């Protein structure tokens, strides 16, 4: 059964090369700026980073759903997304390539191939990935690690267990 959802985001310039963005479902606003390389401020999110963040977040939540429906257990997933932007004053700047580097941690070596297959399936199913029409390269990595102790963060587990 298909369902349709609508999402709204508003953005407005505040001054110079900076602005604010917000959505209906969150009381928080995001301060953003043009990229520092293009004359914007350091230390603020840029529209380029927000696009990559949307892809990383969507990939993460899509993988969680794919893994859950496949009854695949994992201990951690970190998704790094890198985008290359070409600046062209006559035609406008644009992304030339996006690299998606998911790092999946599983309990046993026997899960490695299944984990890789689910990462590839996630790329095909990810809503934001499908919405971006430029080339995207998936560079998945699956590693084995220990199961963190209940209540520990992944960072705590990495430090305390040597994961």
Stretches found by the model and what they are:
Residues 58-59:
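Alpha-helical metal-binding/catalytic segments enriched in His/Glu/Asp
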Residues 1-53, 64-163:
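Extended beta-strand/beta-hairpin segments
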